[in-house]
């Protein structure tokens, strides 16, 4: 698949799986909602219930920015299966203003954020490599 098609498929997914590296080298993977703008992905710590706003994924990124994100499409007709992976480097923006382009992109994408925009830390991933697969049978 061409890069534009990989981006299009990735952006069409409502959720991605974010994989980061724990300080001890073990992988850590969680589902996230996100907005994609070009080769930059944004995901915020929002008001959904959590034990803490200082999440493991944020601690991992602060220690090691390497990450990968995966979206996929599955259905019983295996001729329609596909997946897209985005490999990149992440950073944490601790207190982004409401005008931050990432916050604005999330507000545009998710109705839930229109009444209560995310106010917690913002994860910003610069995608360095797109890869994917689609069934051809």
How would you label these PLM feature ranges?
Residues 1-17:
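Short, basic/aromatic recognition patches
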Residues 14-50, 69-72, 82:
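Short beta-strand segments
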Residues 44-45, 51-67:
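Compact nucleic-acid interaction/catalytic patches
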Residues 1, 74-137:
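Charged, gly/pro-rich active-site loop segments
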Residues 6, 53-60, 99-106:
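Amphipathic alpha-helical interface surfaces
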